[in-house]
Amino acid sequence: MTDNPQVDAWNGESGRAWVEHADHFDRMLAPFGGAVLGRLGLRPGDRVVDIGCGVGATTLSIASIVAPATAVGVDVSVTMLDAARTRAAATGCSNVEFRHHDVQEEPMEAASFDLAFSRFGVMFFPEPDRAFANIRQSLVSGGRFGFVCFQRPSDNPMIMLPVMAAAAHVDVLATPGPTEPSPFSLADPDRIRSLLGSAGFADVVVEPGPSSGDLGSADDLEGAARRAIEQNPGIAPGFAAASQPDRAAAVAAATETMSRHIVAGRVVMGAATWVVTAHVS
């Protein structure tokens, strides 16, 4: 256990859920990561660090573009990093490396990367000012930084509605404050600009990102509901600890909620995200 419940969750139930359903989550989140990568303009030879790389899909995708340079994925979840390494070995990718690394607590080597990227991996820092300063010092002069993060909870039914339905039956963690570590800690675009500017980044651009998420086939509504619960660090521990009847009730409630959001045979729910880019001057 650590003093950061988010880190504990990603090394616990949420991390295990992401490993179990990695292909599903990669498909669901690909448009969000792609929105960032499309703005960064990766080139062969770029040295890239993928922050909060999880099970490694984005790092492997980056590696395929920047070869012969190495793409480095860092994460605090040992569980997910083990899966990432297994994936890399299975693909035969040789220009990728995965490191257990807390970007906030452990500065990376100075000027060791041309570009830093993150798909929903920078919202969980207890001290984001330190984390962003460490990312800044890891980049060369002229280096680029891009990430995607969520806007306000109320604008993200994709995340909130299944959890709110399930919360009537299983325990959830206390709701974090608006700037405390959580998926929504960077919802305020002015805060993003302030944090990055203070860290030494220039030309900070905050733009709306993808506005919906595909949570899976309508033929597997119950599976989609279970995944939505198990991957969420705010409710996954309580769901795992609950009795079987309570877990079943939670999944049933989330399933009913998600059944109202079927489009062309898919479960499609609204999202609100920011795509953020910045440079090192």
Regions found by a protein language model. Give the residues of each.
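Conserved class I S-adenosyl-L-methionine
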Residues: 1-46, 57-61, 80-83
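C-terminal helical/coil "lid" or tail adjacent to the Rossmann-like core of SAM-dependent
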Residues: 3-7, 14-21, 203-264
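Class I SAM-dependent methyltransferase SAM/SAH-binding core
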Residues: 47-106, 130
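A short acidic, Gly/Pro-enriched loop at the edge of an enzyme's catalytic core
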Residues: 104-115
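A short SAM/SAH-binding and catalytic strip from SAM-dependent methyltransferases
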Residues: 114-129, 151
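Helix-to-beta-strand junctions that scaffold the AdoMet/dcAdoMet cofactor pocket
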Residues: 125-126, 139-141
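Conserved catalytic/acceptor-binding region of the Class I
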Residues: 129, 144-217
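Core SAM-dependent methyltransferase catalytic element
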Residues: 199-202, 225, 274-281
